[in-house]
C-alpha cells in the first residue's frame, strides 16, 4: 500500500510547529511547588585522597556527602561487562574517600535557588592529599604506572584480541605501510546540557525522575540497582530533549543523587548542568591511538591488516555500556566493508584520571574509519594509484552480498563500489586534479579526499553479547491503539530527541492503516506509559521501534478488516483495507465507524471477534541478528594555506545508502547534522589535558566547535538498496554522517600537502598541527641537506 504521506514521502516534521514556536517542554521549563536547586562540590584535582570535608555549621542539613548516601544504603554505580578479564570499577555517586578525575562530584548542596546552592558549595572545604596522575593512556599502561584503582594490578579495564597469526603475510607481502594514528578526546556539547528534576509522588508512592535522557528504562534500572528499590517504585520521564549524541545515554551520578534527595527530603529538586560543568566534568569521547600496518599486493589489493589500538576510557566504567564497548568494537569493526583474508587486532581499554568515556555519535566507527581510510590512501600512494581506484580494488562487490567479512560481520546488502564511483563523478575529480596541477593564484594547495564507511545498526542479541554489554538489546515493542474517533495512538519505549519519531513513526503507521498523519499521536519517553525499551542509540530506532510499530499496525489492520467485513455482511477474505477504510467491492466502512462499533456498539460485533480489540502490543526483531548495514562514500575538496595552516572546504559530497528511506528529508537532516559534527572532529574539537589531569578547555573560547560559516553546503546523493531483513527494507542512518568526515578531510589535507612531503595522521587537523608538521618536514629536509654536504 503506497501513500503520499507514507513510507518514502518527504513529509514536514510534525514536531517543528511546537518546537519552533517555543512550545517545547524541557527540564528547564519544569516548575514544581517547593522545588529546590542543586549544586555540586566538584574535585579540582585529577587524583587525590579526601582527608576531610568541612561543612559550615549554618549549612549542615543542606550539604550531603557519600557518607549520607551510603548510610541510607545507596550503592555505587556498577557497570560491568560480560567479556572475560574485565575489571570492574565502582563509581559512587559522590566521591568515597578518593577522587579520580577533575570535576568528580564530592558533595551536593541544596538551596532555594541555584545561586544560593553554588554559594553554599563554595563554602564547603575539602581537604585533598594529591596522588600521582595518569593523564596519558600510553603512559598509564606501562609497568609501574600509578594505579587509578588501588586494588587493580594495572590500569587496563580489558584487553581483547581478534583474528589470528598473519606472520606469513607480513613476511611476504609486496607492499607494507605502517602508520601511528591518534584521535583527540572530545566533549559532546548538545544544545541542551543535562538536566534532572526529581520528586516523590506521594499519591502513587513513586520517585519520579524527569531527566534529559535517551534511555528512560535503562536509567530506571540503574536507579533501582543503586537505590536498592524495586523498579516499580521509580518512574523516569524524558520530556523534550535538546540533543543527546550519547552524553544522555547513560546513568549519571547526578541522577542517583537527585532521586535519593527527592525521597529523603520529600521535596522536588533540580540540577541543571552548566556549560563549564559539561566541558570540564562530564563524560568525554573518541580518544583512540592506533599502531596499524597494511599489507597489500602491487595493485593495492589488501592482503592483511595488523593493528594495536588503545582507547582512553577514563576513570570509571559507565552504565550500561561499560568502559570496554569502544575498544571491543574497534577489534571487530576495523576491517569494515573491505574484502581481505588476514587480520589481527589487539585492543586495550585504558583507565586514566579523566572523566569516563561515553559512546558518541558513531561510537568507535569514527576512529576506525579515520584509521582504516588513511591506510587505504597510504597503500594507494605506495602502489602509485588513485585512492578511489584502490577502494574499488578492495570493497566487497555487490555480487558477494550478503557477505561475511574477516571478522564475520554479516553485511546484508549494498553496492559499495558504486558509491565510490558516484562520489568520484559527483565531486568532478578530474576537474579538481587539473586545478590542483595548475596551482592556485593565491598559493593555496588543493586536495581531494575520499572515505568509505559502513554503519551497522539494529544489532541483535548475539552482537551485543559479543561486545560484553550486560544490557543486551535485540528486540523492541510498540503499542498501537485505535481511539474512539478513529485516530491512532502509538506508544514506544524509545525516546525522540531530534530523530523525528513523531513524524516517521506516524508515516509507518499511515503506510499500513491509511490513517491521516494529523490523527496519529506518539507517546514516548515515559516508563510509566510505554513498553520496555533499551532506548534511542546506535541508529536503532527506525529499524527496531519502526518495525514494532509496523508489526502492531499490521495486526490492527487484520482486526479492522475482519470487523469491517462483518459490518458489510461480507467474508474477511473479500475485504481490503485502503485509505483508512475497509472496502468490499464498492462498499466501504471507515475506521472511525469501526472504532465507534467497538467502543460504543459492541452488540454489532461478530461473535468470534478478537477480544484484544483495537489495541495491540507487538514485539519486533529483524530477520537477522546481525542487523543492517548502511554505508556511504564521502568526497571532499579542500584548499590548504601552507603559510597559515588554514583549511577551507570547497566542496563536499555524500553518496549514501540507507535502504528504504521512511522520510528522505529527515534522512538528509541527519546526514547534514552528522557531517557538521564530523567536521568538528576533523578540524576543531579537542579536550586537552595537562600532565596533572587538568582540562584545558573550560569555555567555547577554548573548545572550538564549527558554526554556520565552517559548515559547507553538503551535496547528498541517495542510493537505495533495501535490507532483506527489515520492515520496508529500512536501515539505520542516524550516526553515519559523523563517521566519515574526519577521514575524508584528513585524506584531502594530506593530498594537498603531498608536494611538501607532509602527512598528518592525528585529529583534529588544526592550523597549529598543520604548521608544525610542515615545519618538522622542512627541518628534516634541511638536516638532510646538511648531512649530504
Placement of each model-derived feature along the sequence:
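Short glycine-rich loop/turn motifs
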Residues: 96, 192-197, 289, 447, ...
Amino acid at each position: 500500500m503506497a501513500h503520499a504521506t507514507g513510507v518514502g514521502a518527504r513529509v514536514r516534521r510534525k514536531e517543528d510547529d511546537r518546537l519552533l514556536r517555543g512550545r517545547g517542554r524541557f527540564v528547564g521549563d519544569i516548575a514544581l511547588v517547593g522545588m529546590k536547586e542543586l549544586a555540586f562540590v566538584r574535585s579540582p584535582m585529577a587524583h587525590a585522597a579526601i582527608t576531610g570535608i568541612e561543612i559550615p555549621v549554618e549549612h549542615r542539613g543542606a550539604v550531603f556527602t557519600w557518607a549520607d548516601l551510603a548510610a541510607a544504603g545507596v550503592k555505587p554505580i556498577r557497570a560491568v561487562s560480560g567479556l572475560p578479564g574485565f575489571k570492574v570499577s565502582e563509581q559512587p555517586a559522590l566521591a568515597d574517600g578518593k577522587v579520580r578525575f577533575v570535576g568528580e562530584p564530592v558533595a551536593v548542596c541544596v538551596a532555594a535557588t541555584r545561586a544560593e546552592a553554588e554559594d553554599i558549595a563554595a563554602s564547603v572545604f575539602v581537604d585533598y592529599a594529591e596522588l600521582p596522575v595518569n593523564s596519558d593512556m600510553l603512559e598509564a599502561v606501562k609497568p609501574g604506572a600509578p594505579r587509578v584503582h588501588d586494588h587493580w594490578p594495572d590500569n587496563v579495564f580489558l584487553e581483547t584480541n581478534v583474528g589470528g597469526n598473519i606472520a606469513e603475510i607480513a613476511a611476504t607481502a609486496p607492499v607494507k605501510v605502517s602508520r601511528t594514528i591518534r584521535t583527540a578526546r572530545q566533549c559532546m556539547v548538545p544544545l541542551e546540557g543535562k538536566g534532572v528534576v526529581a520528586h516523590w509522588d506521594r499519591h502513587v508512592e513513586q520517585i519520579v525522575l524527569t531527566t534529559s535522557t535517551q534511555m528512560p528504562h535503562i536509567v530506571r534500572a540503574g536507579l533501582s540497582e543503586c537505590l536498592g528499590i524495586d523498579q516499580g517504585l521509580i518512574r523516569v520521564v524524558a520530556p523534550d530533549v535538546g540533543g543527546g549524541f550519547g552524553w544522555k545515554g547513560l546513568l549519571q551520578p547526578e541522577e542517583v543523587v537527585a532521586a535519593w534527595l527527592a525521597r529523603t527530603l520529600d521535596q522536588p529538586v533540580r540540577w541543571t548542568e552548566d556549560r563549564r560543568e559539561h566541558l570540564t566534568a562530564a563524560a568525554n569521547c573518541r580518544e583512540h591511538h592506533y599502531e596499524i600496518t597494511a599489507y597489500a599486493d602491487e595493485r593495492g589489493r589488501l592482503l592483511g591488516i595488523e593493528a594495536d589500538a588503545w582507547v582512553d576510557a577514563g576513570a570509571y566504567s559507565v552504565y550500561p555500556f561499560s568502559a570496554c564497548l569502544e575498544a571491543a568494537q574497534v577489534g571487530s569493526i576495523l576491517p569494515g566493508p573491505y574484502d581481505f583474508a588476514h587480520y589481527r587486532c589487539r585492543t586495550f581499554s585504558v583507565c586514566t584520571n579523566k572523566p569516563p568515556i561515553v559512546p558518541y555519535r558513531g561510537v568507535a566507527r569514527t576512529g576506525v574509519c579515520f584509521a582504516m581510510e588513511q591506510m587505504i590512501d597510504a597503500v594507494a600512494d605506495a602502489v602509485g594509484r588513485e585512492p578511489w581506484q584502490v577502494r574499488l580494488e578492495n570493497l566487497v562487490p555487490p555480487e558477494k552480498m550478503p557477505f561475511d567479512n574477516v571478522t564475520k560481520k554479516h553485511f546484508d546488502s549494498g553496492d559499495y563500489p558504486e558509491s565510490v564511483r558516484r562520489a568520484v563523478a559527483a565531486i568532478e575529480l578530474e576537474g579538481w586534479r587539473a586545478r590542483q596541477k595548475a596551482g592556485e593564484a593565491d598559493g593555496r594547495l588543493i586536495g581531494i579526499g575520499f572515505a568509505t564507511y559502513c554503519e551497522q545498526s539494529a544489532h541483535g542479541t548475539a552482537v551485543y553479547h559479543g561486545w560484553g554489554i550486560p544490557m543486551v538489546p535485540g528486540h523492541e515493542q510498540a503499542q498501537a491503539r485505535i481511539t474512539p474517533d478513529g485516530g491512532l495512538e502509538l506508544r514506544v519505549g524509545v525516546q525522540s530527541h531530534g530523530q523525528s519519531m513523531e513524524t516517521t513513526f506516524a508515516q509507518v503507521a499511515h503506510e499500513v492503516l491509511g490513517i491521516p498523519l494529523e490523527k496519529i499521536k506518539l507517546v514516548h519517553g515515559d516508563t510509566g506509559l510505554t513498553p520496555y525499551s533499551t532506548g534511542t542509540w546506535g541508529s536503532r530506532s527506525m529499524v527496531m521501534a519502526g518495525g514494532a510499530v509496523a508489526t502492531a499496525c499490521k495486526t490492527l489492520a487484520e482486526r479492522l478488516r475482519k470487523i469491517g467485513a462483518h459490518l458489510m455482511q461480507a467474508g474477511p477474505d473479500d475485504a481490503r483495507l485502503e485509505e483508512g477504510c475497509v472496502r468490499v467491492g464498492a462498499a466501504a466502512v471507515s475506521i472511525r465507524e469501526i472504532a465507534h462499533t467497538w467502543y460504543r456498539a459492541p452488540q454489532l460485533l461478530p461473535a468470534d471477534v478478537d477480544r484484544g480489540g483495537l489495541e495491540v502490543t507487538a514485539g519486533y526483531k529483524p530477520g537477522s541478528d546481525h542487523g543492517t548495514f548502511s554505508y556511504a562514500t564521502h568526497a571532499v575538496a579542500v584548499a590548504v594555506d601552507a603559510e597559515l595552516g588554514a583549511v577551507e572546504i570547497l566542496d563536499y559530497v555524500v553518496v549514501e545508502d540507507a535502504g528504504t528511506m521512511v522520510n528522505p528529508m529527515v534522512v538528509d537532516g541527519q546526514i547534514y547534522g552528522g557531517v557538521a559534527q564530523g567536521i568538528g572532529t576533523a578540524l576543531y574539537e579537542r579536550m586537552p589535558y595537562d600532565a596533572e589531569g587538568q582540562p584545558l578547555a573550560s569555555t567555547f573560547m577554548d573548545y572550538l566547535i564549527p558554526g554556520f560559516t565552517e559548515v559547507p553546503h553538503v551535496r547528498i546523493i541517495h542510493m537505495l538498496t533495501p535490507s532483506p531483513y527489515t520492515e520496508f527494507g529500512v536501515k539505520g542512518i542516524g550516526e553515519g554522517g559523523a563517521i566519515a568526515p574526519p577521514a575524508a578531510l584528513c585524506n584531502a589535507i594530506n593530498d594537498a600537502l603531498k608536494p611538501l612531503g607532509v602527512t598528518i595522521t592525528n585529529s583534529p587537523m588544526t592550523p597549529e598541527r598543520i604548521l608544525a608538521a610542515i615545519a618538522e618536514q622542512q627541518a628534516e629536509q634541511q638536516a638532510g641537506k646538511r648531512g649530504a654536504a
